[in-house]
UniProtKB/Swiss-Prot annotation:
UniProt-listed PANTHER family: NADH-UBIQUINONE OXIDOREDUCTASE CHAIN 3
Protein name in the entry: NADH-quinone oxidoreductase subunit A
Taxonomic source organism: Bacillus cereus (strain ATCC 14579 / DSM 31 / CCUG 7414 / JCM 2152 / NBRC 15305 / NCIMB 9373 / NCTC 2599 / NRRL B-3711)
Cellular component per GO, a single term: NADH dehydrogenase complex
Subcellular location: Cell membrane
Protein purpose: NDH-1 shuttles electrons from NADH, via FMN and iron-sulfur (Fe-S) centers, to quinones in the respiratory chain. The immediate electron acceptor for the enzyme in this species is believed to be a menaquinone. Couples the redox reaction to proton translocation (for every two electrons transferred, four hydrogen ions are translocated across the cytoplasmic membrane), and thus conserves the redox energy in a proton gradient.
Class of enzymatic activity (EC top level): translocase
Residues spanning the membrane: 10-30, 66-86, 91-111
Amino acid sequence: MASVYENSYMIVLIFLLLGILLPVVALTLGRMLRPNKPSAAKATTYESGIEPFHDANIRFHARYYIFALLFVIFDVETLFLYPWAVAYDKLGLFALIEMLIFVVMLLVGLAYAWKKKVLQWL
């Protein structure tokens, strides 16, 4: 019986090693085989075929990052809600209560952000 489990873990280990080794080997071979002729034209920023007319490093206001984090949080919520909604009829009442607790926790966080006026644009 133990050999079945060992065999399963061996398959996972092989896939993990292949998943790490294949990209590393491909990138290493590409770096070794490609021609290396650096020039000033290759080092410039490409902007729609014309020379860039200002610096590419633009500072964004910190509020953009807060909105991005809130978006990621609710995007991950969607990732959790979709499989639950697909398998809802098989999961039962316990899964419904768990998902309601999860959604309520996110809504409490959203209400807190709203109260602290994080959602106001500049």
